[in-house]
């Protein structure tokens, strides 16, 4: 880096041309996130039968507040129960069951990896998001590109476009705003039932027990996978003020609107 570049990055006079990104600032990360955890238990019974049921639900947000990542969410709903029945002095039976619904939603891009590995001035000479009002009003070719863009981000009353360089056509901020989102879904079910016979009339201490059990689990991922264009700015200074006088587009905006399903898996184990 030249002394001039070092000065401009440290001075912060134009953070959109000379970025100095703090990935851990409150601009991108919440100080806290919400988590809700609710559990209810029901039990009862009499001389011949006893039952127990547990119903639980939790919902958890995320620290991130950028793009689709602001909607990151994990939820889990679980129901578990069992019934024990004494049919008579010689026969007992039981049923246990459990089912779980698990969903995890997330925006594209690995923010924490970027925070740990990316330089604070990445991509060099262009912040990931640049306000459109930094473009010279007379730069008609640049405005034509911006007006045709499918990814103009509005924050705090200003419009931003996705920026980068020819060497860096993607970045984590653009991913979170424009690359789409994904959801991982898991469903689990366990069931077992058994009957126990007391055969002491045949032989003292002799019992017979039969069991049937099912363990079923399925999981899959759904996603909306988008492509996006970034714009490389050319800067000029007029009367001491820096403006963007030209933009070069890298890539294309593509949103099919189709939901993709992948990673589907299902397993079932039966026991008799």
Per-range role (PLM):
Residues 80, 87, 92, 205-209:
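Transmembrane beta-barrel domains of bacterial outer-membrane proteins
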Residues 69-84, 211-216:
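Short secondary-structure subsegments characteristic of cysteine-rich extracellular domains
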Residues 90-106, 237-272:
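C-terminal low-complexity, acidic/polar tails when present
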Residues 1-66:
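Residues embedded in well-ordered regular secondary structure
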Residues 8-18, 24-31, 66, 70-71, ...:
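Extracellular/periplasm-exposed beta-strand and loop segments of Gram-negative cell-envelope proteins
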Residues 1-17, 89-117, 183:
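N-terminal, post-signal-peptide soluble/periplasmic segments
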Residues 1-3, 100-162, 217-248:
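A surface-exposed, glycine/aromatic-enriched loop/edge motif typical of exported proteins
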Residues 30-50, 55-57, 96-98, 157-224, ...:
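Outer-membrane beta-barrel transmembrane strands
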């Amino acid at each position: 880096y030249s002394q001039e570049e070092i000065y401009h990055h440290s001075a912060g006079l134009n953070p959109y041309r000379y970025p100095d990104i703090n990935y851990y600032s409150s601009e991108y990360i919440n100080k806290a996130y919400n988590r809700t955890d609710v559990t209810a238990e029901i039990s009862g019974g009499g001389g011949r039968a006893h039952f127990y049921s547990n119903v639980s639900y939790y919902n958890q947000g995320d620290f991130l507040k950028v793009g689709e990542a602001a909607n990151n969410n994990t939820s889990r709903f679980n129901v578990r129960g069992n019934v024990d029945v004494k049919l008579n002095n010689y026969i007992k039976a039981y049923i246990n069951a459990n089912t779980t619904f698990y969903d995890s939603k997330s925006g594209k891009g690995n923010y924490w990896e970027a925070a740990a590995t990316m330089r604070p001035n990445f991509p060099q000479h262009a912040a990931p998001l640049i306000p459109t009002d930094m473009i010279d009003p007379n730069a008609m070719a640049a405005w034509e590109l911006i007006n045709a863009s499918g990814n103009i981000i509005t924050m705090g009353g200003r419009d931003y476009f996705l920026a980068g360089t020819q060497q860096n056509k993607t970045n984590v901020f653009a991913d979170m705003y424009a690359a789409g989102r994904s959801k991982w879904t898991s469903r689990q079910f366990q069931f077992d039932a058994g009957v126990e016979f007391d055969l002491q009339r045949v032989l003292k201490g002799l019992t017979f027990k039969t069991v049937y059990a099912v363990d079923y689990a399925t999981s899959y991922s759904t996603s909306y996978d988008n492509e996006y264009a970034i714009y490389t700015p050319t800067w000029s200074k007029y009367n001491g003020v820096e403006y963007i006088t030209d933009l070069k587009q890298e890539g294309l905006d593509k949103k099919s609107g189709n939901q993709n399903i992948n990673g589907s898996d299902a397993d079932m184990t039966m026991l008799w």
